[in-house]
Amino acid sequence: MLLPVVAAVALFTGAASAAPQPSFTGEQLVGTLSDDFWEPTTTADPHSSYVYQAVTAIGSHECTNHNCPGTSIKVRASSDGGGSWGPLVFVCGTACKNVGWQFDPQLAVASDGTVYAAWLNTFNPGTVLSKSFDHGKTWTAPVTMNGDLSYNDKPTLVISPSGRDVYLTFDDKTDDYSVASHDYGASFSAPVQTNSDAYEYLSYGGTIAPNGTVYFAQTGEPKSGAGDEPVSLVRSADGGTTWTRTTIDTSAEPPVCTFKGCYADFYSSQATIASDSSGKLVFAYLKSTVDGGPKSLHVRTSANGTNWSAPVLVNARGDSDMPAIAAGPAAGDFRLVWQDNRNGVNAWNTWYARTTNGGATWSAAVRLSNLGSGAPYKTTAGCTFPFGDYGGLAVDSTGTNFAVWGEGDGICTGGGTGGSWWTRGR
């Protein structure tokens, strides 16, 4: 039974054994221990064995005289489904001279194999888009989309299967904006404001349903500085001309991050969304019921994006963070990864669960971060800090999962170091 969002309450929780027993390779480091890689993400080609990973490479620059980004977006490709990887390539190094830094990478692949990358070229112009036609070896000059905005942050990218329709959302410190392109990212509409309330919305995931409706999953932070956070969905059914916002749930004020240099909203609620081949939507989000308390991971499902099921509890152990969700090849098949510290305050791990019945029940959690050594920030209990604002998950046409996440000893803005780790499996 589908319930209107406003009436949805916790009626049941996910049960174990909703999917076949998974099997993953051991986690592997992207690059080396000397690399300081933050904000990893990944995508898989829908019609080939190519897989891509992107990272924010802290302190990495392509110019010998240091006049191009000192923190740069890098991408690498695998032509054999993650069996081997090519070199990490600067998406816009020397081509972005006099750009101070780059953060927040996003990746997507069109049906013809074109790879789309979006990221921040500082806060102004903010989000830019580039494409690769040769599996990430070279990239086009970045296209801006900020319009009259002088600041934007936290981009989320989605594309239609052909790549013709490109949508991004980002915030400008106070409000959320979305842009659309219907010429394969060559040009973009003026930014459209999607909210008019007392919250600054940050997006963590998006999807395009088979009928073309675009969805972005977001959480709101009070412009006043403290208070409950609405867990929100913004959608467009007219190609990005107009947007409708729905509050799915509300989370209490988040836990405080006490690491040196950590920003106040690091442990805020997050939300993400995926759609399958039938148009079924699964919305995954983090929720705390007590100010400063740990966040649990929940999902809600919908057949139309308007009416949503009651929440299904996926994880209530420790403080959940960094959720990422992706649909599998079959209808009703969704995969979910997240990080939590169930093993101790400074013992973070990455976990995986799957549903094959559209989100009604979920498999038992499987630990992906299985190495208890190999980096100074790792122990058998987990890593010291979830290094990076996001993680990533992609599923290829054979049903293989590709997950990537961050591990470290603190936040990069406070001098912490760490790396990006990944695994694959079914």
Where are these regions (language model features)?
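Extracellular, repeat-based ectodomains that mediate carbohydrate processing or recognition
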Residues: 18-426
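Secretory targeting and sorting signals
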Residues: 1-18
